Amino acid sequence: MSLVYLMATNLLVMLIVLFTLSHRQLRKVAGYVALIAPIVTSTYFIMKIPDVIRNKFIAVRLPWMPSIDINLDLRLDGLSLMFGLIISLIGVGVFFYATQYLSHSTDNLPRFFIYLLLFMFSMIGIVIANNTILMYVFWELTSISSFLLISYWYNNGESQLGAIQSFMITVFGGLALLTGFIILYIITGTNTITDILNQRNAISRHPLFIPMILMLLLGAFTKSAQFPFHIWLPKAMAAPTPVSAYLHSATMVKAGIFLLFRFTPLLGLSNVYIYTVTFVGLITMLFGSLTALRQYDLKGILAYSTISQLGMIMTMVGLGGGYAQHTSDELSKFYILVLFAGLFHLMNHAVFKCALFMGVGIIDHESGTRDIRLLNGMRKVFPKMHIVMLLAALSMAGVPFLNGFLSKEMFLDSLTKANELDQYGFVLTFVIISIGVIASILTFTYALYMIKETFWGNYNIEKFKRKQIHEPWLFSLPAVILMLLIPVIFFVPNVFGNFVILPATRSVSGIGAEVDAFVPHISQWHGVNLPLILSIVVIIIGLILALVVNWKEVTHQIIKSASITDGYRKIYREFELYSARGIRALMNNKLNYYIMITLFIFVAIVVYGYLTVGFPHVHQLHISSFGPLEVILSVVTLIIGISLIFIRQRLTMVVLNGMIGFAVTLYFIAMKAPDLALTQLVVETITTILFIVSFSRLPNIPRVKANLKKETFKIIVSLVMALTVVSLIFVAQQADGMPSIAKFYEDAYELTGGKNIVNAILGDFRALDTMFEGLVLIIAGLGIYTLLNYKDRRGQDERE
């Protein structure tokens, strides 16, 4: 149950932060209260490292909807532990950084940290979920919380557009992911991820295997900003920098990669998956690194660099996916090397990219700009950030003595050995190496170019709006700590490799500790080999390009004619146009029109059900005994109902409608149900009175003459609806699928202590229904109250 308690702790902290919203003095400490959640979460995961290394996994399963195998199924293994550590430890730094970044006087701190806590809670849920539907719920929660965080400064138009764009693309991917999970359930009959992976060989032979893979890939590519779905990530940079440092470099964008790692033992059985992921990753890596060079905004450079680095990791996920087809032959060592390298670089990227974002945030916060055309010579003002960002950028570029060099070497080693695989010949291997090396050169170029344009050159204070610029040490602390980790990981890589990456590799492989024999030992020096030569080539050419070429002009000419963002905007505008037309066609302010649409949909669903399972048998209908009173009431009700179709006077219609309600009251009396009769009488009386009282507030609408065609159509609709309801009564009488609950009602007094069966039903047997019905009424009341207050502030308006 420890995982449940962990999630509950995060929710509790969220509630405490929510409480600070109503207290002005407490708002200032909302960030420090929120900091408790990542500290507790990271402490928990660190304490579980020894257990996971010994293959002692933590699992919790609580029934939710067991009939369709949807349960609160949580599991902590090596892969979820690694991602959990990244989410929580980076979270500690980002939460603290955010307390210094946001203004205590102008920013709504509790609201921001509630959103951030919701996101962290959702990400933890994704990585420990062992049920596909539960994972999907958390998956969409990350999209919702990301939308809220990107639009935090909602008065900014860029924030609004970025939030909508990211939400639409990631939710589209989420729906595709859900489709893939449903296909998996159709194939296997289970939603439990471990059970699904155990059936991987049977699943791979199913005709729906490839469609399922494509759906999961859509979910992963949209979430992890892979080409051509990458366009949401640069627009998301309108969010506060702590959001960019956390969501868009270290956590949310890694969710798609986590998904593919989790299902690698299954997905890797298909060459379609291997080719698609590998080449989409390479294209994304190349496109992102090239596009980063045409940016003026520091966060824009980092956004495209993140896209490029995600493409690099995705390439390794694709190359290593073939392990599912070679779990015990001579190629196993290569596949495990690639998967290990992908996990290693994922960790390294979280460290150096988060440090870069924090550095950019400090520069922007203190100087008021992120434009590299204005930021020359900033090393004189931000000496600590100069060192932090220089080391982080060089690590991203793959320079020796920094952690990025180790994983970049492993990446290049993987590319050079691709020709040993069954899926790749000499030509494909040459293409893969060429794209990988070119993208690596461009990565080195934009990394050094960013540092050169920001920190080197002549400093001119007149370019800045703020004339007093300083570098707060407390603000810089999280970035400095991350910077120190960069060389530490390089010099002691196997500490992280053995305690974090090895258990994750076991989980990805699907065979546990048996994979240990193939896991590489991370070394800083492998001798002079092809990957080292390629690294030297990357550094030399990258230095020349970064210091000599004017990349703004070059890449602007290359990319300006192929803007995917313009295509997205055109599609979005068309979507808005057709949506507006559809809304205008449906929402014509005529209540009877709305009711007919609702009834039509209801009848269509019922008819579809009958066509699918068959129509009810009329000869099996059981008709209860009835007397003269029931006959009279039925005839009176029928006459009143038909009259309502033709009558135009409001008062008469309300009175007749009330008479139908009173007739129902008499029905209840005839059936010896006095409580229901009394309730119906009171409700009907109050409703009728409220209708009549409201007449004085209603506008004068000209009386419309009766139209024979319209009235005939209304009668037909009424008859069809009546026949549908009667047919459902037939079905209810003939249904025998579920056990009777009459025994509960017979024992109502003993079970509930209630002498009134209706009270027992509402207060005990269906207590949750009653509670949620009351909650719906409360929410509706709050909505009406809000609208009335809004009207009072805006003034009286006849349309309102």
UniProtKB/Swiss-Prot annotation:
It is a multi-pass membrane protein. Keywords: Antiport, Cell membrane, Ion transport, Membrane, Transmembrane, Transmembrane helix, Transport. GO terms for cellular component: plasma membrane. The keyword Cell membrane applies. Its main location: membrane. InterPro entries: CPA3_Na-H_Antiporter_A (IPR050616), MrpA_C/MbhD (IPR025383), MrpA_C/MbhE (IPR046806), ND/Mrp_TM (IPR001750), Proton_antipo_N (IPR001516). It holds the Pfam family MbhE. It comes from the Bacteria. It is found in: Cell membrane. May form a heterooligomeric complex that consists of seven subunits: mnhA2, mnhB2, mnhC2, mnhD2, mnhE2, mnhF2 and mnhG2. This is Putative antiporter subunit mnhA2. It comes from Staphylococcus epidermidis (strain ATCC 35984 / DSM 28319 / BCRC 17069 / CCUG 31568 / BM 3577 / RP62A). The gene is mnhA2.
